């Protein structure tokens, strides 16, 4: 599986490290706070994504590790930029 993370705070950072340490394929991170995504990508040996859409395309499982108050906004962004994206990419979403 290819795991991607939208959000690179404590939860995304830690979960990505756990997966990477257990030989799982962490493809990378996207965050509105670039520095956090860059740091998380370095820490997990993965990639920093400047573009959320590219991370979606490269992932099979997408962890949404953003604050609860941001989920609706994030969902609307994903829907508007990726028509039929769940079927096209066979993608699973998980919010933690």
For each feature predicted by the language model, list its residue ranges.
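Rossmann-like NAD(P)-binding element
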Residues: 53-79
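Conserved small/polar residues in nucleotide/adenosyl-binding loops
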Residues: 94-96
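Hydrophobic/aromatic beta-strand patches that form the interior of the parallel beta-sheet core
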Residues: 30, 49, 63, 91-92
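NAD(P)+-binding Rossmann beta1-loop-alpha1 motif at the extreme N-terminus of oxidoreductases
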Residues: 1-50, 54-56
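Short active-site oxyanion
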Residues: 24-28, 59-62, 87-89
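Short, conserved loop/helix-junction motifs that constitute active-site signature segments
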Residues: 80-86
């Amino acid at each position: 599986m290819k795991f991607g993370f939208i959000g690179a705070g404590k939860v995304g950072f830690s979960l990505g490290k756990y997966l990477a340490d257990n030989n799982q394929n962490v493809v990378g991170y996207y965050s509105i706070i670039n520095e956090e995504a860059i740091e998380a990508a370095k820490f997990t040996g993965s990639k920093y994504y400047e573009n959320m859409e590219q991370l979606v395309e490269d992932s099979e499982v997408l962890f949404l590790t953003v604050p609860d108050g941001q989920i609706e906004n994030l969902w609307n962004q994903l829907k508007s930029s990726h028509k039929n994206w769940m079927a096209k990419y066979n993608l699973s979403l998980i919010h933690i």
